From Swiss-Prot:
It holds the Pfam family Telomere_reg-2. The gene is telo2. It comes from Xenopus tropicalis (Western clawed frog). This is Telomere length regulation protein TEL2 homolog. The lineage of its organism: Eukaryota, Metazoa, Chordata, Craniata, Vertebrata. Residues 467-480 have a biased composition (Basic and acidic residues). Belongs to the TEL2 family. Keywords: Chromosome, Cytoplasm, Membrane, Nucleus, Telomere. Residues 482-493 have a biased composition (Acidic residues).
């Protein structure tokens, strides 16, 4: 009998010359006999030699020959025979030949046939056979690692290869959303083969299956693969210890370079800590890479993870005694990071929220003995961390620090009073507090909460029995009979007293100087009445206010908080704004000078900034009390009212106006446009005094005094001042002084552009936008072209590299605004 190599060589030579369909069929059948699948199959030794040495060259020859000449000879039966070479031989070699042929072949009959065969190859589940074959080969003494790497690359990126080859003619089977779930099913089949082999006492290797999982996840397809793989593994490991060991080995064998995407996907997919513990086992203790990912990187850096994933990770650490020491270690590291001043200052808010969530989840999972061992760390972190968060200029960060500090103090001393802060609760604060309870406790509470209304519903109340309802009807009839005999007032409508106010014994002062005396006194009732009417009185008596404007502003700025006076802070702010609007030059000079003076609290300095911005806005608006003579406003002067109190017969009548009104009322109009009164022009009062508000405030910011350091610890006030300067700049639109103010503000921004506080940087970016909106583009490019170019470069850098989301957004807005202004100028030469 001729050797296999000779037979194969002769068959290939004949096939290359055949032009008859029947001879082609006979030649193919003679080659197929070596596959060992037909009736006339060759001996086992010959089949093994053919598969090892000749199978791949034969497939490559068949792919090369398929074309217009062979297509005329191949009927449907012969095409099926051609396909069987790929579908019935060694799957790993057939898969590689098909994938390589697709990459080398352009649009042609050959490409269509290869795609068709590959589609059938996947539909019959041959991927599982490919993976299993490679797993078996890895048990050999000299596995072909290069071949395995090639198969691994083709399996993990098959949708990308097919999309590049077929482009718009791609098949739905090759789409990622369809392929990777099918691949997950193939991996489950391979694991089932491993389970069966282990039960038969055979050796197995699943490292190649682990490599497939790792590489697919590394390419960003965790969701498609693990959404099928994790639920199937969850159901299998719960009932079988062999499956549990297979699952653990599957994840242990994932290469370290691909471990991160695999663990991240499993953490996000696994529904709870119990499932995660069943899938991973003690992998976090055995594998250093896994321990680093689960206890450091995911908890400190990957702040895109949701709170459910964090609860799964930390709950997984707490579910077994061999892992609980890692939970205590994580708590100490979280406390150190949370209390770090550098972290609070330089980290974005989402990352701080992420660390705070992890910290509170840890606290909720520790028992009393573990918390007792960490009490000193808790105390040190509380004392240093609370201060750093309270010093933050970002309100959300301050509020978050308050919540965590309250929880830490409660765990340090459960029986003591603990810390308590005043803050407005929002969704984040409520979520943080809820994290102290493990997930199963939260679910129980919510379930009870849902059940309570059902238990107390009217349908299940004892009052719904027929006897009780009958008794209640009799009682109602008796009550109605007794009430009918009485002369009651039940039908009277009660008087509406919702708008009533409490009568005050003290009257509101009529003069400004009287108000000053009341403000300096200790009479709380008079003070309340005076504060309620002070702003209105200032607006009505402008001349008298200007005489004592500085004294009044000084008293209002220094007056102590009066909790007994309703809306005291709001009324004081309104009065300060009113006196500043009445005498803007004098009061603004006083306030800006006092802003940098000694012995003022941060609250007073921020009050000054609020008053300056509110007063500037009021000055830039049209005065509400200025109306035209035709507006029909009522004169409230009592003398004028008495002098004009004529009888109806003495009132002079404008007969022309009466006639026009009668004609208008009798006239029927089918269409009438909107009649709008022509606005009365009025000067912008702020433009004339803008410099008195702006320049004194901007010139002394770098001067350090004993109790006030804007460039140091008082960055919250610096941020508020920067925003105030931006508001003052924005209100100078169309003002002659706008260019001068804009140049000074750009220089100010350039000095502070590298400030570490995100709130300050947000204010600086806001100032740039106000300069662009207030100063004409022509003046910007002529008077301060160099500053504008430097500012544009800085905006681009911030938009690309800044750690704060709001800063990046404001920088992009500034760049878009700058580009829009430039295009408007170029479009209108």
């Amino acid at each position: 009998m001729a050797p296999v190599s000779t037979v194969v060589k002769n068959a290939i030579s004949d096939l290359a010359k055949i032009s008859d369909g029947e001879r082609l069929r006979e030649a193919l059948l003679s080659l197929k006999s070596y596959l060992g699948t037909g009736e006339n199959s060759a001996q086992t030794q010959e089949t093994t030699e053919f598969n090892r040495n000749h199978y791949t060259p034969v497939l490559e020859f068949l792919v090369a020959q398929i074309g217009p000449q062979w297509l005329d000879l191949l009927t449907s039966e012969r095409l099926e025979l051609w396909d069987s070479f790929f579908l019935e031989g060694p799957p790993d070699q057939a898969f590689l030949v098909l994938m390589d042929s697709l990459g080398k072949t352009g649009p042609s009959i050959r490409l269509d046939r290869c795609v068709h065969v590959l589609e059938r190859f996947l539909q019959r589940g041959a991927l599982a056979e490919v993976i299993w074959e490679v797993c078996q080969q890895q048990l050999e003494s000299n596995p072909t690692s290069v071949l395995h790497e090639a198969i691994l690359g083709r399996i993990s990126s098959l949708p990308d290869h097919l999309a590049n080859c077929l482009q718009q003619h791609n098949k739905p089977l090759f789409y990622p959303k369809n392929y990777y779930p099918r691949l997950a099913g193939s991996i489950i089949r391979v694991l089932q083969m491993v389970s069966d082999a282990l039960r038969d006492g055979k050796n197995c290797s699943i490292s190649f299956a682990s490599q497939v999982v790792g590489k697919v996840c590394m390419q960003g397809r965790q969701k498609e693969l693990l959404s099928v793989l994790v639920p199937r593994l969850k159901s299998l490991v719960q009932s079988d210890c062999i499956w549990q060991r297979i699952c653990w080995r599957l994840l242990e064998s994932v290469p370290d370079r691909w471990m991160e995407p695999v663990l991240t996907g499993i953490v996000q997919t696994a529904p709870g800590a119990e499932v995660l513990s069943q899938l991973l086992g003690d992998l976090v203790v055995k594998n250093k890479r896994t321990q680093f990912l689960l206890t450091k990187k995911m908890l400190f850096l990957q702040y895109g993870l949701k709170k459910d994933a964090l609860q799964s990770i930390l709950g997984y650490l707490s579910l077994d005694a061999s892992r609980r020491h890692l939970l205590v270690k994580v708590l100490r590291e979280l406390l150190e990071v949370w209390s770090s001043g550098s972290v609070v200052k330089h980290s974005p808010h989402p990352q701080l929220l992420h660390v705070s969530r992890c910290l509170l989840i840890c606290l909720g999972l520790l028992n009393k003995q573990e918390i007792e061992s960490c009490k000193q760390d808790l105390l040190v972190s509380l004392t240093s961390g609370a201060r750093n968060y309270l010093d933050s200029s970002v309100p959300t960060t301050r509020r978050m620090g308050m919540v965590v500090a309250e929880c830490l103090s409660h765990h340090i001393d459960t029986e003591g009073p603990g810390l308590s802060f005043q803050y407005e609760e929002d969704e984040d604060t409520r979520d943080l507090k809820a994290l102290l309870k493990p997930p199963h406790m939260v679910e129980t509470d919510s379930a009870d909460f849902v059940k309570r209304p059902v238990e107390s519903s009217p349908s299940k109340s004892p009052l719904s029995s027929p006897e009780v309802r009958e008794k209640s009807k009799v009682k109602v009839k008796a009550d109605q009979a007794s009430d009918s005999d009485l002369d009651s007032d039940d039908d009277l409508v009660p008087y509406d007293m919702s708008a009533d106010t409490e009568l005050k014994k003290s009257k509101a002062p009529a003069y400004i100087r009287d108000c000053i005396e009341v403000l300096l006194s200790d009479d709380v009732e008079k003070l309340e009445v005076t504060m309620a009417s002070l702003a209105t009185l200032i607006q009505a008596n402008t001349l008298a206010t200007k005489e004592v404007s500085m004294e009044l502003a000084k008293i209002l700025l220094h007056i102590d908080e009066k909790p007994s006076v309703a809306r005291f802070t709001e009324l004081r702010h309104a009065a300060l704004v009113a006196v500043t609007v009445t005498d803007p030059v004098t009061v603004s000079q006083y306030l800006t000078s006092e802003f940098y003076s000694l012995n003022y609290s941060l609250r007073q300095r921020m009050d000054i900034l609020d008053v300056l911005s509110s007063a500037a806005q009021s000055l830039s608006e049209k005065p509400s009390h200025e109306t035209s003579a035709e507006s029909g406003s009522v004169n409230t002067d009592p003398h004028s009212i008495r002098s004009t109190a004529w009888t109806s017969s003495e009132v002079p009548v404008n007969w022309r106006k009466v006639v026009e009104e009668r004609i208008a009322s009798k006239t029927r109009r089918f269409a009438k446009g909107h009649s709008a009164a022509t606005p009365v022009p009025a000067p912008n009062r702020y433009h004339a005094v803008a410099g008195h508000f702006f320049f004194p405030l901007i010139q002394n910011y770098d001067r350090q005094i004993v109790t006030f350091d804007l460039l140091g610890e008082d960055r919250l006030v610096l941020g508020r001042m920067v925003h105030t300067l931006g508001i003052l700049m924005h209100l100078t639109l169309n003002a002659p002084i706008a260019s001068q103010m804009g140049k000074a503000l750009l220089e100010f921004v350039w000095v502070l552009r590298s400030h570490t506080d995100a709130f300050v940087r947000q204010g600086l970016l806001f100032c740039i936008s106000t300069v662009l909106l207030s100063v004409p583009w022509e003046h910007l490019m002529t008077d301060m072209a160099e500053e504008v170019v430097e500012t544009q470069c800085w905006l681009a850098e911030v938009a690309e590299r800044d750690s704060d989301d709001d800063c990046r957004r404001l920088a992009l807005n500034g760049l878009f605004l700058m580009e829009k202004l430039r295009s408007n100028i170029q479009g209108n030469p």
